[in-house]
Regions:
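Short, flexible active-site-proximal loops enriched in glycine and acidic residues
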Residues: 17-29, 97
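Helix-loop segments that flank and shape redox-cofactor active sites
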Residues: 26-35, 193
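Conserved acidic
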Residues: 4, 8, 34, 41, ...
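Histidine-centered active-site/metal-ligand motif
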Residues: 5-9, 29, 260
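Internal glycine-rich alpha/beta core junctions
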Residues: 34-185
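Single conserved hydrophobic/aromatic residue that forms the stacking wall/gate
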Residues: 1-16, 20
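Glycine-rich cofactor/substrate-binding loops
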Residues: 153-318
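N-terminal alpha-helical segment
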Residues: 12, 106, 144-145, 241-245, ...
Length: 318
């Protein structure tokens, strides 16, 4: 998992490409919030998997110990140098203090890291699934000419690979609790952990490895729709600039609460009557007595949301 070279991570050169800088809608609670870029979404995933790689390296180091210390860890019938020699030959560290077995907190940490990685895989998969929904459709998994999306409905293109990753992630995470429960062995050892590890050891490692390969292939072949991203940005007709408008009103001397209520009333009017927020504000004499038309146009500009994108990229990818 660590040695396989990553193929689908944003690089500085990629950050400069059009699709990575493409503006799209940022969402919180599933609702339109404020504009971001598609590249920032990917950079967020990149940073998370970079942390995961470090976690996995640390977890492998944590679990890479050797114990040949006798029935209860006292070296009663074996020289400690044997343990040291074997550990060196195997590229392991001698366990500082063992019982009949290596303490299982080490293994619990390793499986917990696999669970975290699975959560990250699912986060990307879930984002793809949401963005491929018909109502959003800003991207989709690759769909070959002869592929079938549904046996009953020929028009469908389902995100089946991302759905599969969601299920696989659940399977990997299901191994974490048993690994944690293996820590509490009786006295200097019982065998309750053995049957668990014989199952979760192969299953968790093989599954997360497969999931990472599948995720890489999805990202390598993903189809992005920039025009749909732009279309979705304009769905709410300027409501996404409500925060800037509210903050600008507070600068004119209004309280934040009053500014909030004013902008909220405008927003409700826009929703109810399918109006553009800019037009509603521009037609309000009270607001226009406090904000110039030039300032109003700057409030409804995407530039403020994009001005620090390169800064964020430089901070993430270095």
């Amino acid at each position: 998992m660590i040695r396989r070279p990553p193929r689908s991570t944003p690089k500085p050169s990629s950050a400069a490409s059009d699709v990575y800088k493409r503006q799209c809608m940022g969402r919180s609670h599933g609702i339109h919030a404020e504009p971001i870029t598609f590249g920032l979404k990917l950079a967020s995933f990149y940073a998370e998997f970079k942390r995961n790689r470090k976690r996995l390296i640390d977890a492998i180091d944590e679990v890479s110990t050797c114990a040949i210390s006798g029935a209860v860890g006292t070296f009663a019938n074996i020289n400690p140098n044997v343990e040291k020699h074997v550990a060196k030959k195997l590229g392991l560290k001698a366990e500082p203090i063992s019982t009949q077995v290596i303490p299982r907190d080490r293994h619990a940490f390793y499986f917990s890291v696999l669970g975290i990685i699975a959560g990250s895989v699912e986060r990307v998969a879930t984002e793809i699934r949401h963005l491929q929904r018909t109502e959003v459709y800003e991207l989709q998994e690759f769909f070959s000419k002869k592929q079938k999306g549904s046996s009953a409905m020929p028009h469908k293109k389902n995100p089946i690979l991302s759905e599969n990753l969601t299920g696989l992630s659940r399977m990997v995470r299901s191994t974490v609790i048993p690994a944690l429960e293996n820590i509490a062995l009786w006295h200097e050892r019982d065998i309750s952990h053995s049957s668990v590890e014989r199952n979760i050891g192969p299953d968790a490692n093989i599954t997360i490895d497969f999931a990472l390969v599948r995720l890489t292939n999805i990202l390598d072949n993903m189809i992005v729709y920039p025009k749909k991203m732009l279309e979705n940005l304009n769905i709410t007709k300027g409501l996404i600039f409500s925060q800037e408008l509210m903050l600008e009103l507070t600068k004119t001397g209004l309280t934040r609460e009053k500014s909030y209520r004013i902008v909220q009333s405008f927003s409700k009017k826009c929703f109810a009557e399918n109006l553009n927020l800019f037009d509603v504000v521009q037609s309000d004499s009270y607001i226009m007595s406090k904000i110039s038309i030039k300032k109003l146009k700057s409030i409804f500009s995407y530039s403020k949301h994009m001005k620090n994108v390169n800064f964020i990229f430089r901070r993430v990818i270095r």
